[in-house]
Amino acid sequence: MTPRKPFWQTKTLAEMTVPEWESLCDGCGLCCLVRFEDEDTGEIIPTRVHCQLFDERLCRCKDYPNRKKTVPDCIKLTPYNIEDLEWMPPSCAYRRLHEGKDLPLWHPLVTGDPESTHKAGVSIRNQTVSELSFKDAEDAMDFVATDLMRDRGDDLYEPEEG
């Protein structure tokens, strides 16, 4: 008997159920970083500054269901806007699947371990500062972090022996 392929290998993003869609999030936190756009080049510049609702220890939104009330410009990812979100990290599951790639080896759906993103060193856990730390939003430019956007989707995953 042939084993069934996982849902992300058999369904398009638009065909996924809400729980399947939500489970694609690996909890890296990279989408919760404050970014700036270079007015001259249009380049997106990420920083090590996170959204006020981001829990830096858990790498999750503190109020996900109601986040738009506090952060009106928070972008909700959908199968219909993912292609317009070029600022998403190349290792993001939503972006990778949209581009026809598979999930990274370190993704929790692949490993079965919800901590695998952190163990693989892909998340921003405890590496950022809250946007609430600044009086002037432009001060976040002192924390530019282009290194965080490198593609880590094909990185090997070698879990530590327990």
Curated annotation (Swiss-Prot):
PANTHER family: UPF0260 PROTEIN YCGN. Pfam families: CxxCxxCC. It comes from the Bacteria. Coiled coil: none annotated. This is UPF0260 protein CCNA_03385. Signal peptide: none annotated. Belongs to the UPF0260 family.
